[in-house]
């Protein structure tokens, strides 16, 4: 029934189907998730599900993984352009005094969106404001855009100097881009996990050497750094994409 998709897609012609496999259970001991979990994986890449399962089997033999989700932030970064540097610098000094007003403006747009911080940076005649929000259980992309619009509109009449022009998003937030901002702040939920893999387990079940694996990671990290890569992990993109697709994201 295409009418159910009104507002969600244009030029609708049908659906794409991707096969979904499952791997698990995997044992997780987290601050919020604690137990054994089955992981859905949408893919046509042969051996991906099997690789998950092989890893989970070894993880479970080591007692599972420890995990924590310690931040949940979504950013928007407006910028204001002024006639010259001294004017912009004056605004950069003034903006931190308006944080409570920014919070009130953001809160007026949503029951869930709350402004957590505002980080100011000055580049030439332009002031950038990195606004970070908590958005409850929502991804919050539209939510934080509306909140940022309200914040800017509340600030503009009070500014000691009127900007030549301004943008609701300057790309400083890192939205839809691989950037260091994800490490410096957060882009959604910030999660960490830890597992200790004894050398004897690695040797028995992976037929590998722990020291050789560590050396490989070190060398690959240096290689990735030469390309300017932001992520230094071992090819998690395929697995994450498969998980996101299976979960409807």
Q: Where are the predicted features?
A:
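Intrinsically disordered, low-complexity linker/loop segments enriched in Gly/Pro
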Residues: 69-71, 77-152
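Glycine-rich anion/phosphate-binding loop at the beta-strand->alpha-helix junction
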Residues: 133-249
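Acidic/polar, glycine-rich intrinsically disordered N-terminal extensions of enzymes
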Residues: 1-41, 51-56, 69-73
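Short glycine-rich or small-residue beta-strand-to-loop segments that form or flank ligand, phosphate
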Residues: 9, 23-27, 40, 77-83, ...
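Short beta-strand elements
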Residues: 24-28, 37-41, 127, 183-197
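Short helix/loop capping segments that flank catalytic or ligand/cofactor-binding pockets
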Residues: 29, 35-37, 47-52, 89-91, ...
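A structural-propensity feature for long, helix-poor, extended segments
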Residues: 54-99, 103, 177-218
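Long, charge-patterned amphipathic alpha-helical coiled-coil/hairpin "stalk" segments used as oligomerization
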Residues: 38-68, 99-106, 239, 244-248
């Amino acid at each position: 029934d295409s009418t159910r998709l009104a507002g969600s897609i244009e030029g609708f012609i049908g659906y794409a189907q991707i096969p979904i496999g499952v791997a698990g259970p995997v044992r997780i001991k987290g601050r919020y998730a604690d137990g054994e979990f089955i992981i859905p994986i949408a893919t046509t890449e042969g051996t991906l599900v099997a690789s998950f399962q092989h890893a989970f089997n070894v993880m479970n033999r080591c007692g599972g993984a420890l995990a924590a989700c310690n931040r949940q932030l979504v950013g928007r970064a407006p910028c204001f352009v002024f006639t010259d540097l001294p004017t912009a610098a004056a605004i950069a000094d003034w903006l931190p005094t308006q944080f409570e007003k920014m919070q009130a403006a953001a809160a007026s747009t949503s029951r869930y969106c709350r402004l957590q911080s505002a980080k100011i940076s000055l580049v030439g005649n332009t002031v950038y404001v990195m606004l970070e929000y908590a958005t409850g259980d929502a991804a919050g992309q539209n939510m934080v855009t509306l909140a940022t619009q309200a914040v800017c509109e509340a600030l503009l009449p009070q500014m000691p100097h009127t900007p030549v022009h301004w943008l609701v998003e300057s790309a400083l937030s890192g939205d839809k881009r691989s950037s260091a901002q994800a490490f410096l702040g957060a882009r959604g939920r910030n999660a960490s996990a830890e597992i200790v893999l004894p050398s004897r387990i690695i040797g028995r079940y992976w037929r590998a050497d722990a020291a050789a694996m560590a050396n490989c990671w070190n060398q690959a990290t240096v290689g990735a750094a030469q390309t300017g890569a932001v992520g230094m992990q071992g090819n998690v993109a395929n697995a994450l994409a498969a998980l996101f697709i299976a979960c409807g994201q």
